[in-house]
């Protein structure tokens, strides 16, 4: 059964995931060809982009020790180090996908606003749609690359089908942990912006 699975799908997920990442970067290149607009708009967009990037780096620095503790705890538990490896790969894949999505979205935002002002809502909708689709492509593609790589490695290192399946479950745990904390942290960050904005305007 192992030989059949490896022979049929050992490289399929990896290749499919890499193709998805390629198309994500193609979309990013197409978006960047649109004008960013006036200097005032570009300045605001750069500030938003920088703030989002600093926030994500700070969040990942705080989240990294938590993920490391989770990996070590899993490795020392009966689940084993193969599951711990899957957790690490899942967390890394989720973090990369989130960063790429944030980076492309903040670059697309300013171009969407400029297109809405100069070219109408049709072009603005296209830019915003493609900018948002980069995140979806990266999530799906990183999932395929991560799981595909783990599946290929586990089928070479392990012979027990149940152990392979249970070890692969760690990928979802790692990816979900990063996604959950990023979602909660991002929500708190956004709420603080909304709270502080009236105060900043009054001052």
Task: Name these PLM-found stretches.
Residues 91-103, 136-144, 148, 175-184:
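Mid-bilayer segments of alpha-helical transmembrane spans in multi-pass integral membrane proteins
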Residues 48, 112, 194:
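Residue-level signature of catalytic and energy-coupling elements of molecular machines
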Residues 4-97, 101-105, 127-137:
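N-terminal alpha-helical transmembrane segments of multi-pass membrane transport
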Residues 36-39, 114-123:
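Juxtamembrane helix-boundary/capping and inter-helix hinge elements in multi-pass membrane proteins
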Residues 2-6, 72-85, 145-170:
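Helix-interface capping motifs at the ends of transmembrane segments in multi-pass membrane proteins
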Residues 12-13, 167-174:
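Loop-to-helix entry region at the N-terminal start of transmembrane alpha-helices
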Residues 193, 198-203:
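Single conserved hydrophobic/aromatic residue that forms the stacking wall/gate
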């Amino acid at each position: 059964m192992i030989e059949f699975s490896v022979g049929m799908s050992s490289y399929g997920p990896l290749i499919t995931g890499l193709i998805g990442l390629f198309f994500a970067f193609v979309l990013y290149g197409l978006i960047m060809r649109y004008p960013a607009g006036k200097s005032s708009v570009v300045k605001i967009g750069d500030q938003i982009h920088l703030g989002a990037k600093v926030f994500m780096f700070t969040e990942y620095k705080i989240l990294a020790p938590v993920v490391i503790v989770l990996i070590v705890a899993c490795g020392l538990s009966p689940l084993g180090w193969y599951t711990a490896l899957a957790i690490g790969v899942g967390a890394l894949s989720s973090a990369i996908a989130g960063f790429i999505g944030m980076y492309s979205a903040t670059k697309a935002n300013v171009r969407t606003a400029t297109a809405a002002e100069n070219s109408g809502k049709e072009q603005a909708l296209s830019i915003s749609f493609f900018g948002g689709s980069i995140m979806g492509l990266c999530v799906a593609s990183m999932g395929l690359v991560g799981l595909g790589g783990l599946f290929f490695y586990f089928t070479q290192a392990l012979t027990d089908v149940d152990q392979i399946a249970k070890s692969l479950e760690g990928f979802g745990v790692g990816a979900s942990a990063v996604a959950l904390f990023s979602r909660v942290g991002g929500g708190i960050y956004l709420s603080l912006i909304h709270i502080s904005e009236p105060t900043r305007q009054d001052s």
